[in-house]
């Protein structure tokens, strides 16, 4: 599983990274979070509002800061 946080480094983007790492730990997953900060690369995902979370190359959350539980749900669904 490839997990990417898309954002330019703003406070919300950093918080999404932190919450995503927490969700990964709570789920006991052995994956790392890649930070995508290049605006051109973010735009290739079709994201117009950050922060965003992509799993295996597909944007699952964009434009808001989700709670840890929402991130866990997204990751669990992606594993199924």
Give the role of each language-model region.
Residues 19-32:
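Conserved helix-turn-beta segment immediately C-terminal to the redox Cys motif
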Residues 2-3, 32-34, 73-80:
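Terminal leader/tail segments of proteins
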Residues 9, 46, 57:
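Conserved functional loop/turn residues at catalytic and ligand-binding sites
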Residues 14-17, 47, 65:
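Conserved strand-to-helix beginnings and helix N-cap segments that scaffold or border functional pockets
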Residues 50-80:
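C-terminal structural segments of small proteins and small subunits
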Residues 1-19:
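Local sequence-structure signature of Cys/Sec-based thiol-disulfide redox active-site neighborhoods
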Residues 29-41:
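Thiol-based oxidoreductase modules, predominantly thioredoxin-like and allied folds used
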Residues 15, 38-41, 70:
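Residue-level recognition of oxygen-bearing side chains
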């Amino acid at each position: 599983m490839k997990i990417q946080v898309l954002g330019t480094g703003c406070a919300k983007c950093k918080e999404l990274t932190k919450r995503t790492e927490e969700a990964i730990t709570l789920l006991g997953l052995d994956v790392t979070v890649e930070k995508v900060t290049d605006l051109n690369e973010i735009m290739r995902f079709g994201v117009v509002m950050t922060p965003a979370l992509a799993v295996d190359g597909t944007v699952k959350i964009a434009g808001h800061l989700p709670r840890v539980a929402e991130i866990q749900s997204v990751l669990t669904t992606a594993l199924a």
